[in-house]
Amino acid sequence: MQILDKINKENISDAFALSMTKFFRFTADTFFAKRYGHRAVVLETVAGVPGMVAGVWMHFKSLRAMKAGYGEQIREMLAEAENERMHLMFFIEIAKPNIFERLLVTSAQIVFGLFYLFMYVFFTRTAHRMIGYFEDEAVKSYTEYLELVESGKVTNIDAPDLCLLYTSPSPRDP
């Protein structure tokens, strides 16, 4: 069962989070259509933002409170952002985005980064809910992509060397 099916969408926070998710999904679907590799580049660009925002915000919270104790949470959030960065690197090798798409990635990072920072600082619950919806949409999008690969409609290429290096039993920092 998907996240969207489990959540009460009656309150304004959930409704806003869901509407933003649908807006971003519509925008990605319209712009990229069935170019799943290129869509994944932008999705992974955006996916790295929440972990970085949360990690940095917790870091500042620790500094403001002048207390230790946030270290593990900070490391987990930043590790999640790093993991998403690596996913982006894999899809860049697969999709080979052109200069326009690279500019789009930069724009998406700036716009979504500022938007998510605002949401996280002032409406934390809604920000978390929105990311839950994003993850659900990512599962749908990647499932569609996988089905196309398995059906032969999209070429199944070898994993990039960077991917193999990163996922090896003793990964090195690429």
Roles of regions detected by a PLM:
Residues 44, 48-62, 66, 83-87, ...:
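Residue-level signal for functionally critical sites in structured catalytic/ligand-binding pockets
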Residues 1-69, 152-164:
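Terminal targeting/low-complexity segments that flank the catalytic cores of oxidoreductases
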Residues 166-174:
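Single conserved hydrophobic/aromatic residue that forms the stacking wall/gate
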Residues 75-150, 158-161:
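Active-site-proximal alpha-helical scaffolds that flank and shape metal-associated catalytic sites
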